[in-house]
Amino acid sequence: MISLQEVNEKYRDVLAEIGNIGAGNATTAVADMLGLRIDMSVPQVQFLPVEEIGTSIGAEDEVIVGIMLGVGSDIDGSMMFLMDMESAQHIVNRLMMRPDDYMEDFDEMDLSAVKEVGKIIAGSYLSALSGLTGLTITPTVPFVAVDMAAAILSVPAIQFGMFGDNALMIKTEFSDELQINGYFILMPEEESYEKILSSLGLPL
């Protein structure tokens, strides 16, 4: 099996294509939803061990927002879209037409709005991956959680069962007046991970 380091180093262009297409689609969708012009930075894309996700996104005790889904059809596993609280609050305030400095706890309507945005962004990346691999990837109904990063990162194993050792992580930054930081994380089962690499034309 090719190592993660080899995948990340030798096939950087293939991974970047997933990130660029997904982020481009996500930017357009979010801009339409918010009614704003949104700029996008170049996404950072890598495969990494599942146990390294926590340290890659920041402090484990930081409160973040996570939108989580299962995936099925040609591949099995789970996926998440994670945002820091400031980014999530900014998006919700825009959608609800509130002042930018509104900082109350999220109510059910707010969480529903966050979930919808997360679903759109995650779906954009899934579509990019599906288009480049030729695989059919079907997401389940999403759910949203607001908690410490360590707690949210433990949810996929509890909700969706076992998954493989490796994850695809895409860090994306959008900006209008405020920078919005987000992480798309796909955690395929081991057999599905191999299927993704093979479908991208990467040797196993």
Label every PLM stretch briefly.
Residues I2-L204:
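Composition-driven recognition of glycine/serine/threonine/acidic- and proline-rich low-complexity segments
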